[in-house]
Amino acid sequence: MKINKFLQLIFKKLVQGIFKLFYGKISILSDSKILYKKHYIEFIRLDNNTKLSVKKNVHQISNARIYTDTVEHVAIIKNNLIIPKISYQQIHGELKGIEFNKVLISGTPRIIKKFDGRVLSLVQGASAHNYFHFLFDILAKLILCEEKIHLSEIDYFYVHKK
């Protein structure tokens, strides 16, 4: 049993190393570099007479990539720099700083799929495994996005497979 685990670990590290050679090492974006647009949303309209204060941002990033392990980590990466405050890491139920994001250690060990057009990322933590979180997270993101970018302008909606 221990030999199997050891061989799995060796294989995993080998695959991660190969992908790091292809895609490069990921670093943390410093605050001095701006690689994206930030759209501030103060409120959303619920109907003609009602507004709800939200005070959130929608981030627009050109030519970036998204990596997720579908549970704890979502990394938004541009030019091999992970973007803090947009990327997400929740480890054992606790939100952590960007320095804990998995891609900084293991890279992005998946084949990159390219999409021509606008992609709205709807991935986040438990939404892949929990129907309530899926609806709660997705609907909120769609409503926020609609305030700045009409959903008909989105070519792809990136959600978890499950």
Predicted segments with their positions:
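Phosphate-centric recognition/catalysis
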Residues: 2-140, 146, 150-156
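Catalytic donor nucleotide-activated moiety binding site of glycosyltransferases and closely related
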Residues: 158-162
